Every structure is written in structure tokens, then in C-alpha cells.
Amino acid sequence: MRAKDLLGRRGEELAAGYLESQGMRIVDRNWRCSEGEIDIVALDGDSLVIAEVKTRKSLAYGHPFEAVGVAKLARLHRLASAWCRDHELRMPCRRVDVVAVLDDGAGQPRVEHLRGVG
């Protein structure tokens, strides 16, 4: 597996652990359909949360949050609808969160979480 893929996988593990520590329940991970992939699907109380995870070694190419623009947010909303259809679930309270993981491999990774970004 490529170093980039390993970093991404580690970031998703850290993000899932962080979300669980915040009281969320992870219900699906790496769900795919023809339109794309959802990194993490979680329940936060009555809300369905679609979490996009962005992991970086450094800020050299910008903060991980900067990698989630308008087009990506629109795709995540479409994916949320597709996930609900696929699971025959009607969840009126949906939100998209972004979890940023900064992990240079030398120290404690930093996890940051933006709720309801779009």
C-alpha cells in the first residue's frame, strides 16, 4: 500500500475514534456508490452525520479543511441521500462534517472537527 493510502487510512481511524469520543456512533465507513465514497457515517443523537476526513502530514499544501470546497460539499450531500436510499432510511436531520487530521508521524496527531459545514 502506498504511503499516501496508509496516511489516509490512519487519519480515518483517528477521526472515527475522535467522533466516538464525542458521543457519536459510527454506523458505516468507506461506503461507496457510483457517485463516490463517504468516509464515515455516524449518528449524533437524532442527526445522521456524513463525515469527510482529510489527512495531511503538514500544512505545506494548505490546511486539510481547504480541500473541501463547494463541489465536494454538494457531492457529499448527494452521497448522503444515496446512502439513505440504499439503507431505506429516512433521516430528516442530516449534516456534513469535516474532520482534519494533521499527522507528521513524529508526535501526537492533531484532530480538528468542523460540524455542519454545508
UniProtKB/Swiss-Prot annotation:
One Pfam entry name: UPF0102
GO molecular function, one term: nucleic acid binding
InterPro entries: Restrct_endonuc-II-like, tRNA_endonuc-like_dom_sf, UPF0102_YraN-like
PANTHER family xrefs: UPF0102 PROTEIN YRAN (PTHR34039:SF1)
Family, similarity comment: Belongs to the UPF0102 family.
Alphabetized NCBIfam families for the sequence: PRK12497.1-3 (NF009150), PRK12497.3-3 (NF009154)
Protein name: UPF0102 protein Arth_2474
